[in-house]
């Protein structure tokens, strides 16, 4: 009967032409050009282990980049945990870019948590709590487990209904699921709670999934490559049909931070019994504080997993920019946090010289108490010269896909050398808009000159403010 219906449908479709519909192309994703989009790494020579003058989007600051590469190597060898580094130098000398390049050199496997010192201060959460959260975000845990799973291509997915005694109609009593591999197939009778997870992941016949035998967690791997020739508007990942038996032992590796474990255990849900269940309980972080007692219990469990070989600790990097904004209470807390057994590498950055320590009143180098300075490895950065600024501007114009006339680019480089590099970088986008307004794609001298007159730099703004202060006020 079904075959007859299919033939009838195919017959009618051949006699009538389907209407032609225009397929609209998917909108091109706009890639945002950030301040350090051109930085791709530290630019270190693999043979000499020294930084190239110009490499990986970086120009100059070779000694600082070489020192940062040594810190990266120490982090990889896990002999840097609990130590701190300070990147100190004038404004616009590449301090944040060096920290970003360090994270790119470390890769995705090592946690990298950026934090601005002003983010520590909040009316809802204590300063020490914000620092502790950041510390635990920067400490990763790689969990390795061998689990009993059912894996294969879905060939049957049938929920079985049964009458409800409460008179509310029919409910799903169990789920019949058939999985197929290259070696054989198996039919499973599953709990109805698993059906909800299957619906959420939109599992259908032809998908490759695996189900953990202990916890019942369902994971959709992808679409079986047998259906790769089918026309589908949605881009899907095609995977080969699993080999071996349907029921097998599988090694599962999951990366999670200590902060994720804190949040997952603050309001535990689901079944207990193994690490993956704890990882699966991750939810949206709350603004309330996690108790020290809970953290100590999690640390005990983590230490047990590490000793038994189930998990591996991955100390990451916590980058705190504008560290001079921290007060003496934060620094006092950092003394103890850096000495704890579970501590990441902390990288500070500041552009201040000798300034007042907040909450203390005394002046100190970089606004950091002397007790903390003794614990730091300090990496200095130097001011860029005119040639460095010119090459940095070349990298930025290439990243932003902007074309300059040679004389206009000379003027922009001169502005960067005389005023500031950041001011010159900020003039690129307005100059392009001025050129486009005049119907040109190439930026000329008049475009750069117009932008310098429309937008003041820091020095001109300060000079104008001082002149206004000296002018006598008109009495009413």
UniProtKB/Swiss-Prot annotation:
GO terms for biological process: box C/D snoRNP assembly; chromatin remodeling; DNA repair; nematode larval development; positive regulation of translation; regulation of transcription by RNA polymerase II; TOR signaling. Keywords: ATP-binding, Chromatin regulator, Cytoplasm, DNA damage, DNA repair, Helicase, Hydrolase, Nucleotide-binding, Nucleus, Transcription, Transcription regulation. It comes from the Eukaryota. ATP binds at residues 89-96. It is found in: Cytoplasm; Nucleus. Gene3D superfamilies: 1.10.8.60, P-loop containing nucleotide triphosphate hydrolases, RuvB-like helicase, domain II. Its main location: cytoplasm. One of its GO terms (molecular function) is ATP hydrolysis activity. Its EC number is 3.6.4.12. It catalyses: ATP + H2O = ADP + phosphate + H(+). Residues 1-23 are annotated as: Disordered. It is an enzyme of class 3 (hydrolase). GO terms for cellular component: cytoplasm; Ino80 complex; NuA4 histone acetyltransferase complex; nucleus; R2TP complex; Swr1 complex. Disruption phenotype: RNAi-mediated knockdown results in arrest at larval stage L3, with less than 40% forming a mature vulva, lipid accumulation, epidermal granule formation and reduced protein synthesis. There is also gonadal detachment during gonad migration. The keyword Zinc does not apply. It holds the Pfam family TIP49_C. Expressed in gonadal cells. The keyword Cytoplasm applies. SMART domains: AAA. Forms homohexameric rings. May form a dodecamer with ruvb-2 made of two stacked hexameric rings. Belongs to the RuvB family. Possesses single-stranded DNA-stimulated ATPase and ATP dependent DNA helicase (3' to 5') activity suggesting a role in nuclear processes such as recombination and transcription. May participate in several chromatin remodeling complexes that mediate the ATP-dependent exchange of histones and remodel chromatin by shifting nucleosomes. Involvement in these complexes is likely required for transcriptional activation of selected genes and DNA repair in response to DNA damage. This is RuvB-like 1. It comes from Caenorhabditis elegans.
């Amino acid at each position: 009967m079904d075959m007859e219906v299919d033939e009838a449908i195919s017959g009618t479709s051949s006699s009538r032409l389907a209407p032609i519909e225009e397929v609209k192309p998917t909108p091109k994703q706009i890639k945002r050009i950030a301040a350090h989009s051109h930085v791709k790494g530290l630019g270190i020579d693999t043979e000499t282990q020294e930084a190239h003058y110009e490499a990986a989007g970086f120009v100059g600051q070779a000694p600082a980049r070489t020192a940062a590469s040594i810190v990266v190597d120490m982090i990889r060898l896990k002999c840097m945990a609990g130590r701190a580094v300070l990147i100190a130098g004038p404004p616009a000398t590449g301090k944040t870019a060096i920290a970003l390049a360090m994270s790119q050199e470390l890769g995705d496997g090592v946690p990298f948590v950026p934090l601005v010192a002003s983010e520590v201060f909040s009316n809802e959460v204590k300063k020490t709590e914000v620092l502790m959260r950041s510390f635990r975000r920067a400490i990763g845990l790689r969990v390795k487990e061998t689990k009993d799973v059912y894996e294969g291509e879905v060939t049957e997915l049938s929920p079985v209904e049964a009458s409800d005694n409460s008179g509310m109609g029919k409910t799903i009593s169990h789920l019949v699921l058939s999985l197929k591999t290259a070696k054989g197939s198996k039919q499973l009778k599953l709990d109805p709670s698993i059906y909800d997870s299957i619906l959420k992941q939109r599992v259908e016949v032809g998908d490759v999934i695996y189900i953990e035998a202990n916890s019942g967690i369902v994971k959709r791997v992808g679409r079986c490559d047998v259906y790769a020739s089918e026309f589908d508007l949605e881009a899907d990942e095609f995977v080969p049909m699993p080999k071996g038996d349907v029921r097998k032992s599988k090694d599962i590796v999951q990366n999670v931070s200590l902060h994720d474990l804190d949040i997952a255990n603050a309001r535990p849900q689901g079944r207990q019994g193994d690490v993956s269940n704890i990882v699966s309980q991750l939810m949206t972080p709350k603004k309330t504080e996690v108790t020290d007692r809970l953290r100590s219990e999690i640390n005990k469990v983590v230490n047990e997993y590490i000793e038994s070989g189930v998990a591996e600790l991955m100390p990451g990097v916590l980058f705190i920019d504008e560290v001079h904004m921290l007060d003496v209470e934060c620094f006092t807390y950092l003394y103890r946090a850096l000495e704890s057994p579970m501590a990441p590498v902390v990288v500070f950055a500041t552009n201040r010289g000798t300034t007042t320590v907040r909450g203390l009143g005394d002046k100190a180098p970089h606004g950091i108490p002397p007790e903390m300075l003794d614990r730091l490895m300090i990496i200095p950065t130097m001011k860029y010269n005119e040639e460095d600024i010119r090459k940095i501007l070349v990298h930025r114009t290439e990243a932003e896909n902007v074309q300059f006339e040679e004389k206009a680019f000379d003027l922009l480089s001169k502005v960067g050398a005389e005023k500031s590099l950041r001011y010159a970088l900020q003039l690129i986008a307005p100059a392009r808009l001025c050129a486009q307004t005049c119907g040109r794609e190439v930026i000329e001298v008049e475009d750069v000159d117009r932008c310098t007159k429309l937008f003041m730099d820091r020095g001109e703004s300060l000079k104008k403010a001082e002149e206004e202060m000296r002018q006598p006020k008109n009495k009413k």
